[in-house]
């Protein structure tokens, strides 16, 4: 029974596609975002890197959870005139879209 908890027997953290910002479309179809769950170890590292600043921490967790679009891509950051995935999220999303991303990230980490 204990073997079910071994690393090699555990399922990978969840990844899911979801609707975050319907205004981003290609060929008339909404571009879905792909987000992933993060480990508690990664979460703790993000907390340290954030300087224990709650606002920065939140943005960093969201950015770390986004698989697609590639928030680290220089071309996407350049198109919004920002540097850094966290800054990109704050610039490219409306307040409601940002809230939708927060909800999706929370759900994928349950």
What does each model-found stretch correspond to?
Residues 1-13:
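Low-complexity intrinsically disordered segments
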Residues 26-110:
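Short, surface-exposed, charged amphipathic helix/loop patches that serve as local interaction elements
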Residues 14-28:
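Short acidic-hydrophobic surface loop/beta-edge motif
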Residues 11-14, 44-46:
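A short linear-motif detector with a strong N-terminal bias
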Residues 10-13, 22, 35, 55:
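Short, intrinsically disordered low-complexity segments
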């Amino acid at each position: 029974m204990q073997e079910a908890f071994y690393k090699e027997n555990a399922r990978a953290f969840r990844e899911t596609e979801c609707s975050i910002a319907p205004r981003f479309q290609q060929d008339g179809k909404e571009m879905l975002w792909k987000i992933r769950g993060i480990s508690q170890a990664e979460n703790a590292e993000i907390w340290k890197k954030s300087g224990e600043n709650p606002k920065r921490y939140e943005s960093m967790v969201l950015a770390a959870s986004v698989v697609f679009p590639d928030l680290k891509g220089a071309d996407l950051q350049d198109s919004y005139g920002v540097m850094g995935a966290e800054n990109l999220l704050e610039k490219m999303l409306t307040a409601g879209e940002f809230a939708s991303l927060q909800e999706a990230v929370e759900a994928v980490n349950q």
